[in-house]
Regions:
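Conserved acetyl-CoA-binding loop-helix of GNAT-fold acetyltransferases
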Residues: 230, 236-249
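Conserved beta-strand-loop-alpha-helix junction that forms the acyl-donor binding cleft
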Residues: 260-269, 284-287
Length: 297
């Protein structure tokens, strides 16, 4: 089987910067760390497929175990180099999954690898057939197909999935009280939920009804986005951006001229990248610092 050797051969890429602890006495990356780079990139590969790996494997009743890992070296990486670790699923057998990988510094190929996994029962570690859903996911991803879709609807159509994800993020993870997580606004809001190809909800948000605001010139319609939640292991995969874009499009289509939100201060940079601007001073909301942000549509 031919090993992919150019960047164009790969859909998936994960970037890293070489740390001081990873170089040896020769001032190059210690050889064993390259395998760690590939192994770490596998987690990003599942994220790119929008799969919460642990819970998905638990539902299927199996897990992947490394059967073989081989690495071939062509050139060395050094401290502070930015590297792109690229992976491609090249074969799915009855119980095996084979990946080819490559590490590039810009366009220079440094390392290639082959990783062979066996899908097995975690209790007995005996091989078992790769689930059809898993096989189809891998095929679709490598074919360049989208891994998620965003649906909008009311509380009756999307509420159950939105509430389950919000409870996991806001109550279980962030410690907000369950009784305040859902409120009266849910009944009148537009809800957006992002689903992966297994129909698992992985991100959500809501758009409240419009309000009319008086401005120095003319009144405008303003609305509020809130309850933005992304599955913990999916963060950084642009799902939050997709939810925001969907809700902003819904607001614009009904004639809203402004979107406001109360951002947790730890998330200011995320909203700023979506074009939002801070307004006013930080304030306490349920024991967490927030700040109002807005965007004109």
């Amino acid at each position: 089987m031919n090993q992919p050797t150019t960047r164009r051969d790969f859909r998936f890429s994960s970037r890293l910067r070489v740390r001081w602890a990873e170089v040896d006495m020769q001032k190059i990356v210690f050889n064993a760390h390259y395998l760690m780079y590939f192994d770490t990139a596998i987690a990003d590969y599942w994220r790119a497929m929008a799969i919460p790996y642990e819970e998905t494997m638990h539902q299927w009743g199996g897990d992947l175990y490394v059967k073989k890992a081989s690495v071939e070296y062509f050139a060395s990486a050094r401290y502070e180099d930015q590297l792109d670790v690229m992976l491609k699923c090249v074969k799915v057998g009855n119980s095996s999954v084979v990946f080819h990988g490559a590490i590039f510094r810009a366009d220079q190929l440094l390392v290639t690898c082959e990783l062979v996994y066996v899908y097995a029962n975690p209790a007995t570690q005996t091989s078992q057939p790769v689930p059809v859903e898993f096989r189809e996911l891998l095929t679709a991803f490598e074919a360049g197909e989208p891994m998620t879709s965003v649906k909008t609807g009311d509380v009756h159509t999307l509420g159950a999935d939105a509430f389950a994800l919000r409870e996991e993020v806001f109550v279980n993870e962030q410690g907000f009280a369950l009784e305040i997580e859902q409120d009266a606004y849910d009944a009148t809001s537009v809800h957006a939920v992002a689903y992966n190809r297994l129909a698992q909800p992985v991100a959500t948000g809501r758009l409240l009804p419009s309000k009319e605001l008086q401005t120095p010139s003319d009144p405008i319609k303003s609305s509020k986005i809130g309850r933005m939640a992304v599955h913990r292991v999916m963060r950084g995969s642009k799902l939050g951006r997709d939810i925001m874009n969907t809700l902003m499009a819904a607001a614009k289509s009904r004639g809203d001229a402004e979107i406001v939100l109360h951002a947790q201060c730890s998330a200011i940079n995320f909203y700023a990248k979506q074009g939002f601007t801070e307004r006013g001073l930080p304030f306490d909301e349920e024991g967490v610092l927030h700040i109002e942000m807005f965007k004109l549509l």
